[in-house]
């Protein structure tokens, strides 16, 4: 491709509204342009990368035995009503009417559509297992689209759905997809972790996220220093170690009128924060027990996902109103604690090991100090309630935990029969009776993969693609002062035609620009291999080569250049 014949729209300055590196560089490199909030045009360089990512995904999915289909973006409301998600889904689901006043949605996901398709096309257990996938546009009406294509309203996703007669068959396909995803992200050159995850609104039992490690990530990824253990922080098990110390001083009621937070209590009374607890009141699961107290250590954070799974806690999880707390307990939220508390109490594992700790007295402006379990208050139910912190023991007993930020680029679920049961998706079983199919689903955010690769691989000059396989071009020909030198122009043209004939994706910068501008643009868009042709070097029979990934330069003998590129460039 010649730059003179190409839509080469690079920017020197970073747009003010671009917050993260990938958004900044995708705009500057001329990969995308905004059209409206959360909506982007993809320009030629962006499309080249996007299609390469799709091709790698498609190759690995086909290799796994999955079969490609294509389903509509526009979906009839009846399917969502049938599954029960018409009422459950929030404002992210864009709903509209056609000219016949029939309800439709712009699909944020395709569980309903694929379940409907398969129940129409598959009738016998002999046709299963079946794994169908598509690469398709999705739309979620995000309240705050941000970070460019990382969290846009319209995006491209690869979503696959498998259908089975048994849980064992589902597990076998799930394992294949886990490995397939690992292969995909390895081929893309990404530093990623597959982590245990919560199933969220999709539903189901087992679930893994594939997280690209990057400081700009929105998720906390937890993994062990000495094993393969990895989990989303929502699911990572918090282990409490040690034994509870014997009680010391007697419990003491203290006036604390100006200490309504843990920070104020610690500061005013010189109390170690690990000797304090937070008493959090949440809505209970039954009318008989409308409020439940969850107690964690003062320096820990409540994990709402874990809390919601407790049978005593309402789902969806919700903190209690302060007025309800005051009416039931008689004290405000800054003065709550386990002693004489008249509602069910659940404490975190680490709290169960505490002794001589401080907590609210359930009287406004008062706290108890030197509280001890079993001496001053009965030991309540114990559960894992908190987020892990760095340095916690790994749940598998190997090493300690590290926490890094991650960007979710893939997610696989064992759905079970959530959708097939709701939508009566059955096949004839071996015994001739109707059998509800068991499902799995497997998604990759294709547009998000592109942004994630940039978040993880860039420098002050621009993008560094982690693999030649997804760079928009693999070789850049940069002829210096070509329009003033016949020898430079002739050799550049010859090299360009030769590389094209060899199947190399090459960009030939034939613009009338200063060399510095040409170098900057090629580094900005991340071309991995740059061939720099200068008149003096040509006279000496040499060509300059620069590697974008390492920034190393070297002189290559002109007659050895093609062999050098063949050995170093992935065609």
Swiss-Prot record:
The keyword DNA damage does not apply. Disulfide bonds: none annotated. Keywords: Aminoacyl-tRNA synthetase, ATP-binding, Cytoplasm, Ligase, Nucleotide-binding, Protein biosynthesis. It catalyses: tRNA(Pro) + L-proline + ATP = L-prolyl-tRNA(Pro) + AMP + diphosphate. It is found in: Cytoplasm. Its EC number is 6.1.1.15. Pfam families: HGTP_anticodon, tRNA-synt_2b, tRNA_edit. CDD domains: ProRS-INS, ProRS_anticodon_short, ProRS_core_prok. It comes from the Bacteria. Homodimer. Belongs to the class-II aminoacyl-tRNA synthetase family. ProS type 1 subfamily. PANTHER family: MITOCHONDRIAL RIBOSOME PROTEIN L39/PROLYL-TRNA LIGASE FAMILY MEMBER, PROLINE--TRNA LIGASE. Catalyzes the attachment of proline to tRNA(Pro) in a two-step reaction: proline is first activated by ATP to form Pro-AMP and then transferred to the acceptor end of tRNA(Pro). As ProRS can inadvertently accommodate and process non-cognate amino acids such as alanine and cysteine, to avoid such errors it has two additional distinct editing activities against alanine. One activity is designated as 'pretransfer' editing and involves the tRNA(Pro)-independent hydrolysis of activated Ala-AMP. This is Proline--tRNA ligase. The gene is proS.
